[in-house]
Amino acid sequence: MFALAAEAANLSMGNLGMGLGALGIMIGAGIGIAGAARGIGNIGGSAVEAIARQPEAKGSIGTNMIIAAALIEGFTFFALVIGLMLTLKLA
């Protein structure tokens, strides 16, 4: 009887550990996504300031801004995919 109760307790703690691991992974991915959002916001703000100071450079500034934002989005997507893969591996 006691062995059955101990086994049930171990099973529930194992599921809890996997759930907390998945939670930690996704919180980490969320922090990465929030950092990327802040970075893209900084890029956009700086680009608008630069265009306001030097309107004739609008084309090159806009192109560089879009390239940098796309690279950041790519890394963000990569972090999200890795987080999902690790979470699904825990299950």
How should these model regions be labeled?
Residues 1-17:
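Short, strongly hydrophobic alpha-helical membrane anchors
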Residues 37-56:
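Juxtamembrane helix-loop transition segments at the membrane interface in multi-pass membrane proteins
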Residues 56-67:
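Membrane-interface alpha-helices at helix entry/exit sites of multi-pass transporters
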Residues 83-91:
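Juxtamembrane boundary at the C-terminal end of a transmembrane helix
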